[in-house]
A protein has these predicted regions:
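N-proximal low-complexity "stem/linker" segments adjacent to membrane-targeting elements
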Residues: 1-28
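Short, acidic, metal-binding catalytic loop of nucleotide-sugar glycosyltransferases
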Residues: 27-36
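Short aromatic/hydrophobic "clamp" motif used to bind/position activated sugar donors
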Residues: 81
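Conserved donor NDP-sugar-binding/catalytic core segment of glycosyltransferases
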Residues: 93-138
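Short, flexible, basic/aromatic active-site loop/helix in glycosyltransferases
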Residues: 131-164
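Acidic donor-binding loop at a coil-to-helix junction in glycosyltransferase catalytic cores
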Residues: 167-169, 191-203
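Active-site donor/metal-binding and catalytic loop motifs
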Residues: 185-197, 210-235
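Non-catalytic, C-terminal membrane-associated alpha-helical segments of glycosyltransferases
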Residues: 238-245, 258-323
Length: 323
C-alpha cells in the first residue's frame, strides 16, 4: 500500500473523562504508519474539555450516545473517517491493516474486533448464550449474524477479515458518504432513555441492511481499554430500559422491514426469546436476588408495545432495506 496516497481523518467521541487513556489514544494515532490528516474530538455539551495532547481539534456536540453516533462530520474533509471511542489503543500498523482490508474486501466499513467472543472459555460461552442470547456459530461468511430475535451470533472460528452483519462500536473505519447516507438521525429516539443501549448494533445492522459491505478485522491490533466513564446509579431503571430498548430495537430493525408473512416468524422468534428471559428471571428469584427483573420483564414489554404505537415513534421514517 502506498502510504502517501491514503488520506483519512479521525473522529473521537468523548465525555472528556478518559484521562490517561485519551492521551494514549492521541499518541497512538500520531505514531501510525499512515498518519491521519486531521483528528477531531467530538465532546458532548456540558463536559469539560480534556487537556490537548497534540494538534487535535475539539468540537462540541449534543449529549447522548446516539447523538454522537449520528454526527455527519462536517468538520472533516476526507472521505475515509476512523470513528473511535476515547479509550482505544492502536498498534502502530492498526490503521494500515484496516485500510488494507477496506480496499482488499471492497468494503464500505471495517471494524476492529475488540471483544473476542470466540476466545472466551467454554463456560463463558455457555453463560453468555443462556443469559444474553449470544451464541457461537460456524458461519464461513459472517463474523456476526443478527438473528430474528435481534440477538447476535458470533463466528467461533473466524478468519482475519470477515464480512459481517454487525460489529463492535469502539473503532471502525468508514466512508463518510456511507455514514451520512444511513439517516442515523432517525435513531435519536434511543437517547430519550437513561442508560441507553443498542446504538452500535442499530448503526452496524442498518449499514448491512442498506446494502453496504461491513467487515470485521480480527487482527488489527486494536484494544479497547474500557475506562467505564458511565456509571449506573439506578440498577432497576437501567435493567428496565435495556429490556424496553431491546424490543424497540427488534421492532425497528427486524419487524418493521419484514414482509407480511415474515412478521409472523420474527414475532414468534422474539416472544420465544422473551419467554426464555422471563423464565430466567423467575429462577433468579429463588435465591432471593434481583426480584425486580420479573416485574421489569412484563412492564418493559407492555410499555414498549405501547411505545411503538405512539405518534412520535410511529412517525419515524422506516428503514429502506435492500436485503
Amino acid at each position: 500500500m502506498n502510504n502517501q496516497q491514503i488520506n483519512y481523518s479521525v473522529a473521537i467521541r468523548t465525555l472528556g473523562k478518559a484521562g490517561v487513556a485519551y492521551e494514549t489514544l492521541i499518541h497512538c494515532l500520531k505514531r501510525q504508519t499512515i498518519v491521519p490528516q486531521k483528528i477531531v474530538v467530538y465532546l458532548a455539551e456540558g463536559y469539560a474539555a480534556p487537556a490537548k495532547v497534540d494538534d487535535e481539534v475539539i468540537v462540541y456536540c449534543k449529549k447522548g450516545m446516539a447523538h454522537q453516533r449520528a454526527l455527519t462530520y462536517d468538520e472533516i474533509d476526507t472521505e475515509l473517517v476512523l470513528l473511535c471511542d476515547d479509550d482505544v489503543y492502536f498498534a502502530e500498523d492498526s490503521v494500515e491493516k484496516m485500510l488494507t482490508a477496506l480496499a482488499a474486501e471492497n468494503a464500505d466499513c471495517v471494524s476492529a474486533n475488540v471483544f473476542p467472543n470466540h476466545d472466551m472459555r467454554f463456560r463463558q460461552k455457555v453463560l453468555k448464550g443462556i443469559f444474553y442470547g449470544e451464541l457461537p456459530s460456524f458461519s464461513k461468511r459472517f463474523a456476526f449474524c443478527i438473528r430474528k430475535s435481534s440477538n447476535y451470533s458470533y463466528c467461533n472460528n473466524p478468519r482475519d477479515v470477515m464480512e459481517s452483519q454487525s460489529c463492535a462500536g469502539p473503532c471502525m473505519m468508514i466512508k463518510k458518504t456511507v455514514n451520512n447516507s444511513l439517516g442515523y438521525q432517525d435513531e435519536l429516539w434511543l437517547d430519550q432513555f437513561p442508560y441507553t443501549s443498542g446504538q452500535d448494533q442499530i448503526f452496524a445492522y442498518k449499514l448491512y441492511r442498506y446494502g453496504y459491505k461491513l467487515c470485521v478485522h480480527y487482527s488489527a491490533g486494536v484494544i479497547h481499554l474500557d475506562c467505564k466513564t458511565g456509571h449506573v446509579k439506578d440498577e432497576v431503571l437501567a435493567d428496565f430500559n435495556k429490556r424496553k430498548i431491546k424490543y424497540l430495537e427488534w421492532y425497528r430493525s427486524i419487524y418493521e422491514p419484514a414482509g407480511k408473512m415474515q412478521k409472523i416468524f420474527v414475532s414468534i422468534s422474539y416472544y420465544l426469546y422473551w419467554t426464555w428471559l422471563f423464565g430466567l428471571s423467575l429462577i433468579n428469584v429463588l435465591p432471593g436476588r434481583r426480584r425486580y427483573k420479573i416485574s421489569n420483564s412484563v412492564r418493559a414489554l407492555s410499555e414498549a408495545r405501547k411505545h411503538v404505537k405512539s405518534p412520535e415513534f410511529a412517525g419515524i421514517p422506516k428503514w429502506e432495506v435492500k436485503r
